[in-house]
């Protein structure tokens, strides 16, 4: 009679089908959780990339705006001896606004701020740095064809044309703006300027004095791109950007004010 020798440890056995299924279930849960987190990370990365693009667009716009603001009101009449002979001759002295400098219509002089509103600002300055005065406008929907676009116009100032009726040449700087008020203005003493619905321009003595007292401009942009949705929340992506800049040059619109040229 042959004897069969048992091998292996006493009581040793393989996995049961139930144990194998439990192990596979646990492994599936772990792998599923890992892939879920990877998917969330990918969605977040995509969202942040789009937000970064919007932020960079806003940053470029604000940089351009700050460069322009630094040139507001230059060159102005303080830099010239008006008793000397000019070639060509000085512009016809304006008589419509006796509180303003008589030569605000001369294209060699930059008046400074000419109109302010919550979503609109008009001013003059040599923004190219070559001494040629430009008429600059930043305005939400300036062209009338892009409701949520902050647009910029730049044209060379024309002599004997009122600063507020200079031509415009619109270009879009930022799209999809939802800010209720892009611009906020502060006077020389830090007091915030209250803006009426129609804005403030120099066509009245009181408003001209307000413009000649503006020292600081705050800009607040909130951009919501309806075509780029956060894949995690399902909502359009929003990006905000704030900045503040101070005026360095004087105003030709009123005399005796903190920022006046005369």
Features from the language model and the residues they span:
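Short regulatory "switch" loops immediately downstream of catalytic or recognition motifs
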Residues: 1, 73-89, 154-158, 185-195, ...
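Aliphatic-rich helix starts adjacent to a transmembrane/signal segment
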Residues: 2-3, 11-76, 256
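Exposed loop/turn and edge beta-strand positions of beta-sandwich/beta-sheet ligand-binding modules
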Residues: 20, 117, 213
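Short, glycine/small-hydrophobic-rich surface segments
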Residues: 47, 69-120
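Short, cationic motifs built from Arg/Lys/His that form the positively charged side of catalytic pockets
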Residues: 59, 70, 147-153, 248
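Type IV pilin-like appendage domain
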Residues: 101-200, 236
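Short linear sequence signals and composition-biased patches located at protein termini or domain-edge surfaces
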Residues: 129, 161-162, 167-168, 172-262
């Amino acid at each position: 009679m042959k004897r069969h020798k048992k091998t292996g440890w006493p009581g040793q056995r393989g996995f049961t089908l139930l144990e194998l299924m439990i192990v596979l279930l646990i492994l599936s849960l772990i792998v599923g959780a890992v892939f879920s987190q990877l998917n969330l990370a990918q969605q977040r990365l995509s969202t942040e990339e789009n937000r970064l693009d919007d932020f960079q667009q806003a940053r470029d716009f604000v940089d351009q705006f700050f460069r322009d603001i630094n040139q507001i009101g230059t060159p102005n009449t303080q830099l010239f001896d008006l008793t000397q002979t000019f070639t060509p001759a000085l512009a016809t002295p304006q008589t419509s606004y006796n509180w303003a400098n008589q030569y605000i219509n001369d294209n060699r002089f930059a008046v400074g701020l000419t109109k302010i509103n919550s979503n609109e600002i008009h001013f003059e300055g040599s923004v190219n740095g070559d001494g040629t005065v430009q008429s600059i406008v930043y305005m939400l929907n300036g062209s009338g064809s892009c409701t949520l676009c902050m647009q910029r116009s730049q044209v060379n100032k024309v002599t004997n044309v009122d600063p507020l009726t200079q031509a415009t040449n619109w270009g879009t700087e930022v799209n999809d703006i939802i800010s209720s008020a892009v611009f906020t203005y502060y006077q020389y003493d830090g007091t915030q300027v209250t803006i009426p619905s129609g804005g403030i321009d120099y066509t009245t003595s009181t408003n001209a004095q307000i413009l000649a007292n503006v020292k600081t401009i705050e800009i607040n942009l909130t951009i919501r791109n309806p075509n780029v949705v956060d894949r995690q929340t399902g909502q359009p992506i929003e990006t905000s950007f704030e900045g503040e800049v101070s005026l360095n040059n004087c105003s030709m619109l009123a005399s005796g004010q903190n920022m006046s040229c005369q």
